């Protein structure tokens, strides 16, 4: 498929256009979730209504309401902890357009920088938010080699880089809407005897495992993904009226290359759960922690993936169109061929071999008095 983009124009002066934009993005609506006190109160009422005893004690509800200690009586707003209120994006575009009687040109460069809604945290040495950068380079040049020969070259390059947490943003959002706000804090204070971040956690409801800590998933690692598209097209159009009126030939050759690569690094967070707490004579709380769940590690384990393909197209066309009195006659003959190869083929036979396609098509039409037509 050939896409027609802007071209140059015959102008004595070069036209330069520059556009800069900055925009703000925010959710239209976020479903409100209950705070810790309302959650525990409603949960107890639901249990009592079904003939069960209350699950959360009045002491826990009271101290959570008073904010006595955020590690012993947590009340976590997971959404506010992981997501920002708004994000920003920037766009820049510059293009040059001009030419003369024999050469026309159009040059364009655009850049786009966009930040997502995820927050950058202070508990990791890498960027935990999400950022996308996109660049587009475009060059269209058309020249008349002779009075009857026109040559055009169109080149477009698109580059895009996405960087962010190894977690999936949609999954993190779902967790912020469903994870219990009072069972554990997002993270406990660091201690001198620890060489890692002590993320909070607690046993699951059925005791078979642990719960999900969205904040730990946000800090679990990062992923860097890159996409690249390059397209170059050369066209030649030759008017052969010197041989016979209405005859012309044209040719097209194009090359397209697509690449994708991703690199990710992840670690297993260290999870801790509260096992005991007490109040000191000075009126301060102290507590004991123990590890829970899968043992964590302090190093990032990486992986990568690559893919891509390249496509070459060739097309030749002969056109003839002429009018003899009330008769209109036209004919066309088109030949095309296409070859596609994978940049990173697998061991399978279908991936190693290129995909090739050839085609030949023709058409002849005849019309009379703009009312009758035949086509073959």
Labelled PLM ranges:
Residues 74-97, 184-194, 199, 267, ...:
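Outer-membrane beta-barrel transmembrane domain signature of Gram-negative proteins
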Residues 33-39, 123-128, 168-177, 265-276, ...:
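Flexible, surface-exposed loop regions and adjacent strand-edge segments
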